[in-house]
């Protein structure tokens, strides 16, 4: 499918697989409970048997999904140094670095996985995602091009859409965003990104429709609510949309609408919206107060 899409359009994201954590946690709980009991030789033997049930794979899985990310990085870095031939440990290190937000480190770790000659298409996709987060566009494009076209996943198409956006290849971007949205059960995030792409191009109506679609999938996605207000404000509609919101969110969205109005020269409307935001917030809302003061109006 990808190859066909590229031909039609012209030339030119991460979670670990679910693991059996419940059994691991049960074994840990059993060991802890036994150690708390009055101990004798028999109890120690049972405790050792319980702990021996924790294989290296169990520990790695626990680190990947339940452990503190920094602790997981230390674990996999130490393990990979001890057993450099094991690509699974380098993969665990790369994924753990992603969890800490160290995208530079993650990209380097994924480089090592790819250099091992045993990287999967999913590994290469993770590497491309790390490069996209670092805005290393040319390297990200090369990384995606190295993935077989038969590897058609949500994350692959999401990254293709982002790179098409960067290149301002709007038709390709739209095609990739649409495909990505169809490959996930939780499309709100990619619909929101697609909407922001439309907004940046000046297609305010198209952006508004996509933000509304994102909210129909995930009604509490605040980023989509805020972007929807921006899209409406771009065509001078400053009324808040009929979406579910808390009082705090209402204040924040009124503040966004106010700034959109002021940016377009509708200063009086913007000032009124700032006062509404200040009144809506259950506590003192400093961003609105500061904006009012900047306009030379009393708070």
What are these model-predicted stretches?
Residues 37-92, 99-100, 108:
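N-terminal leader/linker segments that initiate helical-solenoid repeat arrays
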Residues 82, 115-117, 147-150, 182-183, ...:
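Structural marker of alpha-solenoid helical repeat scaffolds
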Residues 92, 126, 159-160, 193, ...:
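Canonical tetratricopeptide repeat
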Residues 87-88, 120-122, 153-155, 187-189, ...:
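Helix-start (N-cap) detector for alpha-helical repeat units in TPR-like alpha-solenoids
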């Amino acid at each position: 499918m990808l190859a066909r899409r590229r031909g039609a359009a012209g030339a030119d994201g991460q979670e670990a697989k679910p693991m059996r954590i419940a059994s691991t946690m049960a074994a840990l709980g059993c060991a802890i409970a036994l150690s708390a009991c009055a101990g004798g030789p028999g109890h120690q033997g049972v405790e050792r048997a319980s702990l021996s049930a924790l294989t290296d794979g169990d520990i790695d899985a626990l680190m990947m999904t339940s452990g503190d990310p920094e602790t997981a990085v230390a674990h996999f870095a130490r393990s990979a140094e001890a057993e450099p031939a094991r690509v699974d440990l380098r993969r665990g290190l790369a994924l753990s670095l992603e969890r800490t937000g160290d995208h530079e480190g993650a990209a380097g770790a994924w480089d090592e996985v790819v250099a091992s000659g045993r990287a999967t298409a999913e590994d290469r996709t993770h590497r491309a995602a790390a490069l996209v987060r670092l805005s290393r566009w040319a390297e990200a494009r090369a990384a995606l091009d190295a993935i077989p076209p038969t590897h058609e996943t949500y994350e692959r198409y999401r990254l293709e859409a982002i790179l098409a956006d960067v290149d301002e290849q709007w038709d390709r971007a739209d095609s990739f965003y649409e495909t990505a949205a169809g490959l996930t059960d939780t499309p709100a995030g990619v619909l929101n990104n697609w909407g922001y792409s439309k907004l940046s191009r000046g297609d305010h109506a198209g952006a508004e429709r996509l933000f509304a679609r994102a909210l129909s999938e995930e009604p509490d996605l605040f980023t989509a609510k805020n972007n929807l207000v921006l899209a409406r404000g771009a065509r001078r509609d400053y009324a808040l949309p009929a979406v579910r919101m808390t009082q705090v969110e209402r204040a924040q969205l009124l503040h966004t609408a106010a700034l959109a109005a002021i940016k377009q020269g509708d200063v009086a409307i913007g000032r009124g919206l700032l006062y509404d935001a200040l009144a809506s917030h259950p506590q003192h809302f400093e961003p609105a107060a500061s904006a009012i003061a900047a306009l030379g109006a009393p708070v």
